[in-house]
Amino acid sequence: MKIQTKATGVLERTSHYLKAGILREKPAWFNVVGSHPPMMDLTKKPKKFDTQAQENDPSRSLFQKKKGGDLFKTRSNIYDRQQRHNSISRVPKLEFLEDQLRDVFYHQHPWEFSRPKTLIENEGNESSQCDWSHMLQLYKPLDGESVVQRTLWLLQDSKKTGKTMSLFEAYDQARFEFYRLRMEEEMSSTVSKEESSMYGAIYPSTNLDWGIKKEQEYIDAWTKVAGEKTKVRDANKDGRTANGSMGADDVVESKQSIWETVFDASDVSEASLEENSNAQTKDNA
C-alpha cells in the first residue's frame, strides 16, 4: 500500500470539493479541523530527500549526517530500536498475600491435595460470604483455604482491636485450630464406623485394598512355584557335585573363552606321529 503523505491537506482538498460542487454538505469535522489544522506531517522519511520540511519531526534525530562523509542515516540501528525504561511499559506482577499463605500451607501439608475438593463455584467469592470469626463453616468443608481466610481475618481483627499480632502468629493460631478440627473429624468418623460395625454394618473394601489383595494372591502363588524351583535347582547342584562331574577342572574350563585353545604336549606328539605314519604308507603305496 502506498504511503499517504497528503493527510495534512485534507482541509484544503475538502474546501476545493465544496467549491466545485463534488460535496454538497460540509462534513461534521470541517469547522473543527479548520479551527485547529494539523501542524506537521508525521510521515517519517529520510532527511536527504526532504531537507526543508519536517523541521519539528520527532524522528529527525534518526537521520543525522554521519561524521566525516556526505552520508545520511536512513534507518535505525539496534541501539535506537531497543526498549528503554522497561519498568514503565512492563505489566506489573500481581502479588497477593493469600497466594503466599496457600503456598506455605500446601508445602507443609502436601497430603491435603489428596482430599476431594469441589471445583464448581457460583460466583467465585463464596469464601467472602462466610463468617471467619471461627474456623468451621456451615457450607464450606475444612481445607487449606479455611486456614488462609482465618489468618487474614485474625490480622484484620488485630488491627481493629489494637492487639499486636504478626503474620506468623496469626498463621500459627489458624493452623492449630485447623489441626484440632481435623482431629475431631477423624475421631468422630472412627467412632461412627465402630458403632455401625457393632450394629452389623459391613463396609466393602476400597479400590486400593482390592488391588493389594489381588496382588498378594499372585505373590503367594509365585512363592510356592519359586520354592519348588529352588529345591529342584539345589538338588541338581548337589547331585552333580556328588557324582564328581563338577570338579576343579570343569570350573576352569567353564571360565575359559571359546576363542582360547589349550593343547597338551602328548596330544601334539601323538598327532604328529600319526601324520608321519600316514605319509609313509602313501609313499610306499
Swiss-Prot record:
Stretches that traverse the bilayer: none
Where the protein is mainly located, per its record? mitochondrion
Task: Please name the GO terms that the record assigns under molecular function.
Answer: structural constituent of ribosome
UniProt keyword terms in alphabetical order: Mitochondrion, Ribonucleoprotein, Ribosomal protein
InterPro entries referenced in this protein's UniProt entry, alphabetically: Ribosomal_mS23_fun
Return the Pfam families for the record. MRP-S25 (PF13741)
One cellular component GO annotation, for this chain's record? mitochondrial small ribosomal subunit
- Location(s), subcellular: Mitochondrion
What's this protein's family per the entry?
Belongs to the mitochondrion-specific ribosomal protein mS23 family.
Q: How is this protein organized at the quaternary level?
A: Component of the mitochondrial small ribosomal subunit.
What name is this protein filed under? Answer: Small ribosomal subunit protein mS23
Q: What are the top taxonomic ranks of the organism?
A: Eukaryota, Fungi, Dikarya, Ascomycota, Saccharomycotina
